[in-house]
Amino acid sequence: AGGSVTTGIQNTLIGGLAGDALTDADYNVAIGYNALSADTLGSTSTAIGISALSVQNFTTATNSFNTAVGYTAGGSVSTGQYNTLIGGSAGDSLTTGASNTAVGYAALATEDAHGQNTAIGSRALYTLNAGADSYNVAVGNDAGYLMTTGTRNTIIGGLAGDAITTGAKNVAVGTSAMSTNILGSRSVAVGDSALATQNSATAVDMYNTAVGHGAGSAVTTGIQNTIVGGLAGDALTDGDANTALGYTAMSAVVTGDG
């Protein structure tokens, strides 16, 4: 451990090959076999776990502020900075992505070069690999699980938004909220199973708002609906521009436009 350190200060290196290439880098913590083993000049990194941050390597003096805790957590990070990765395999495909937070087993496991994502929960944002900084927030087991290039989505709850692939600017809060939506964008679902079956076969701005337990839970391709109340509009499928306010409001309406 630390076999190459020359003038570096205040490094804590514990484990075979931990911090083994560091020379004059400072303020690093590497605990575990092969943790932070390739970096030479990067400072202010914390790597705890076998092969955590194992390929990170700054060739000029740089404060990385990366934190990786868990087996292979951040194991592919090369020059990405300001990442917090906690959990086995969390963020383990990240290379140059920056300012990501992944907490949970395999959270944000596929994203490589982009940043500004927050994934909290086992396999949250598991398949995300956006083409640019994407500003997604997913909290809950499998939240946003299938998202690939979606951007600016806020997803909170187990299985919430877990079918979204390229949809953007959606808000889904509650277990199974918006759970089958794939391509639809700009919808808000707050409540257990709200907009649970919304699913557009093409990329489209849907502008549905559903607030309440089961609100709009049968909506599939309907757009521009505003549904507020427990079980409100829960039979509506493809109607457009409807407004339902109150418990079970419009609960018998299946189709029809406002």
Language model feature labels by segment:
Residues A1-G258:
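Glycine- and small/polar-enriched repetitive beta-structure motifs of secreted/surface proteins
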